[in-house]
């Protein structure tokens, strides 16, 4: 029984260390990289910009990409 408890504690410690390492050493998302799931991870001087996507009047998604700050994109006609 003690072995099971000890093994559980060791596994918990390992998982906690892995999660802490991922947060402290996280890699940033480069220019034009997708940031839909992690909008705060774009590299310095880059913003995560999102837009709504519609097909036949129905919203089908909200894709997000890392873009340069202060850049405005316009739709081509």
UniProtKB/Swiss-Prot annotation:
Keywords: Disulfide bond, Secreted, Signal, Toxin. The keyword NAD does not apply. It is found in: Secreted. InterPro entries: Spider_toxin_CSTX_knottin, Spidertoxin. The keyword Disulfide bond applies. Contains 4 disulfide bonds. GO terms for molecular function: ion channel inhibitor activity; toxin activity. Disulfide bonds: none annotated. It comes from the Eukaryota. Residues 21-26 form a propeptide. GO terms for cellular component: extracellular region. Expressed by the venom gland. Residues 1-20 form the signal peptide. Belongs to the neurotoxin 19 (CSTX) family. 09 (U10-Lctx) subfamily. This is U10-lycotoxin-Ls1a. It comes from Lycosa singoriensis (Wolf spider).
């Amino acid at each position: 029984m003690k072995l099971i408890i000890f093994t559980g504690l060791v596994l918990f410690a390992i998982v906690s260390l892995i999660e802490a390492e991922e947060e402290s050493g996280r890699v940033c998302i480069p220019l034009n990289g997708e940031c839909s799931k992690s909008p705060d991870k774009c590299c310095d001087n880059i913003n995560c910009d999102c837009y709504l996507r519609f097909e036949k009047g129905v919203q089908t998604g909200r894709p997000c990409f890392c873009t340069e700050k202060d850049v405005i994109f316009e739709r081509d006609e």
